[in-house]
């Protein structure tokens, strides 16, 4: 009789404990998701494209970046070279097309490295997590090195993956990520560094661009060409590891001499451009123009 009463008391205690854990977990989840942005239209959070002035023949005279940002010219995914897409996935998120927005193995590996060092030395952000952080989080929260921020980022990434296709996510990411030198997105980056449209990039150029987002200032090919070249080699080796290219293709791309574009904001026909800018500013207002 006494043993039966003890077993019953134990089951009651376990039931209460499990209920408390479940309630605490639910409360923690509700606290984490409080204030998270809606995902009805991710494109609404994207950066505004630059204003452009053309001559009567359709030649670009000048590009006016939005204030506090930089050059930005979104393009469809099918206008981005396959090599650039593959280089980005190999470098930033090898399991992109298979993971649910977060990579559990990368998280565990990163957690172990951070635990061993006693500080955050390794990240585990997928492409979707990076998109969530850069597009949906405030600048203050974006750079927080806290568990709360990482959990909110993971929840957003999971929700994005449930709502959008992988190609839609990849296109948004490649159109929004920062490449340095005031270039946001692959089209602006291709124009900034190589003076050409992104669709015209070859493997060597694609690998160079794909390596920039990790640390645009450090890998800036204009100011740190040796760092940029070393980063390109890392990207090419990752592409080989993922089976996107052969070792011989990587070697030839690494040996290719790259030709960079001149200054970013050169103005053709400056007097005419400034005249047009003045007319547009009076007609549309500064905020709508930029």
Residue map of PLM features:
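Non-catalytic, structured segments within soluble enzyme domains
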Residues: 25-26, 30, 119-290
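Terminal hydrophobic membrane-targeting helix
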Residues: 32-83, 87
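Residues immediately flanking
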Residues: 56, 64, 91-94, 176, ...
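Acidic/histidine-rich, surface-exposed loop or edge segments in extracytoplasmic proteins
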Residues: 63-73, 89, 113, 214-217, ...
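Flexible, acidic/glycine-enriched loop-and-adjacent beta/alpha segments
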Residues: 45, 76-127, 185-187
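N-terminal type II signal-anchor transmembrane helix
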Residues: 1-54, 95, 115
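Residue-level signature of transmembrane alpha-helical entry/exit and packing/kink sites
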Residues: 9-13, 82-83, 149-153
């Amino acid at each position: 009789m006494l043993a039966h009463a003890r077993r019953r008391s134990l089951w009651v205690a376990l039931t209460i404990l499990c209920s408390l854990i479940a309630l605490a977990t639910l409360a923690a989840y509700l606290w984490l998701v409080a204030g998270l942005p809606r995902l009805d239209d991710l494109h609404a959070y994207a950066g505004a494209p630059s204003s452009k002035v053309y001559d009567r023949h359709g030649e670009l005279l000048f590009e006016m970046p939005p204030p506090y940002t930089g050059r930005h010219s979104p393009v469809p995914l099918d206008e981005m070279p396959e090599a650039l897409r593959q280089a980005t996935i190999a470098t930033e998120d090898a399991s992109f097309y298979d993971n649910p927005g977060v990579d559990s193995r990368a998280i565990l590996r990163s957690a172990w490295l951070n635990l061993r060092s006693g500080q955050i030395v390794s990240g585990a952000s997928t492409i979707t997590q990076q998109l969530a952080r850069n597009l949906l989080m405030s600048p203050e929260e974006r750079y927080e090195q806290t568990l709360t921020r990482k959990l909110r980022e993971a929840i957003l990434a999971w929700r994005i993956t449930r709502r959008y296709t992988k190609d839609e996510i990849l296109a948004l990411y490649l159109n929004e990520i920062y490449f340095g030198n005031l270039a946001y997105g692959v089209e602006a980056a291709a124009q900034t560094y190589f003076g050409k449209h992104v669709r015209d990039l070859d493997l060597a150029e694609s690998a160079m661009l794909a390596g920039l987002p990790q640390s645009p200032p450090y890998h800036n090919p204009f100011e740190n060409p040796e760092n940029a070249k070393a980063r390109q080699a890392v990207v090419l080796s990752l592409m080989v590891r993922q089976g996107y290219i052969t070792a011989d293709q990587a070697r030839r791309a690494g040996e290719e001499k790259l030709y960079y574009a001149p200054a970013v904001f050169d103005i053709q026909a400056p007097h005419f451009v400034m005249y047009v800018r003045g007319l547009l500013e009076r007609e549309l207002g500064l905020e709508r123009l930029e």
